[in-house]
């Protein structure tokens, strides 16, 4: 009988990216290696999926019913885990529902339960001040994260910062660095074309840099490339988080404020038109824990589309952009220095073409989900062998 793995998620398949952009692609690849994967989901953020089940190829997705409150939901999750009888339980983020399942199952002696693995793709505590969690909730989530890291039979991590941090907290647990990957693009997938335009695209959740940094960058970009418009795409992770950015950029008594467009959330259907306008995309990031710990799906997909990228060499951005896949800017670069690099790329079509082609080739060679999923399959075999 083929082995079973049960992924226990903390949320559903909505705007939060982890489950649909990381867990599901890995599960699909595991199925090609003979595993029978199940994704167990508490769909509190996607209530339209309440109590729904379906198959995604050979991957089973189970959304529990939400009625009855947290304790009843936890009971349903544990019931489904027991019904599945998995050979491996893989907790997706050590928080909320998934963290509670991990805590409960860990109470069972190791020889009476399957291995419990943890997948970490973020440092959850770094989000508490951004989301303005009440102190009791912030402290509980911090405890969940710290406890979950220390109580796992194995850990998969999306960034090297997480590997180092979790490796120190749980040095005896086997650990696998497993960054976010990409799938080979469809023939009709949005793709950047040379000589597309002179505008600059900034995908943001308004947490990467400060409003002051962005205002200084916009002013400097206007001076160095006055024909370029800064396109700011993305929705804030918390309502109102974009207001300081808008206020500072709009109030600045500088012509640069007229060369900024606020696009809001951009979905996949809008990307082709955007790519036709831009000469490059930017991924600035300050060297905070939040930025060092994460592994940007958006950056990976932008590089895969052949878009010339200028990025801060912070965390996994430095890994994605290595070997000429992106124009990497030193961590301590000023906004003016970052803008100078962007202006140079915009003024050099040959560099744009080289960046785009190198990025596309490198992402497919080093970050294909099929390769990463095969590594996870081997990691599972190692865990079961122990």
Language model features with spans:
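Conserved donor-binding/catalytic core segment of Leloir-type glycosyltransferases
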Residues: 6-8, 191-222, 230-232
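Nucleotide-sugar-dependent
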Residues: 17, 209-212, 267-271, 281-301, ...
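Membrane-proximal helix-turn-helix segments that form the acceptor-binding/catalytic region
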Residues: 25-28, 78-79, 99, 107, ...
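Glycosyltransferase donor-sugar binding loop
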Residues: 42-46, 229-247
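Carbohydrate-associated surface elements
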Residues: 161, 181
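Nucleotide-activated donor-binding/catalytic signature segment of Leloir-type glycosyltransferases, i.e.
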Residues: 243-272
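Conserved acidic donor-binding segment of nucleotide-sugar-dependent glycosyltransferases
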Residues: 323-336, 344-349
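A short, well-ordered alpha-helix in the C-terminal region of glycosyltransferases
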Residues: 344, 351-366
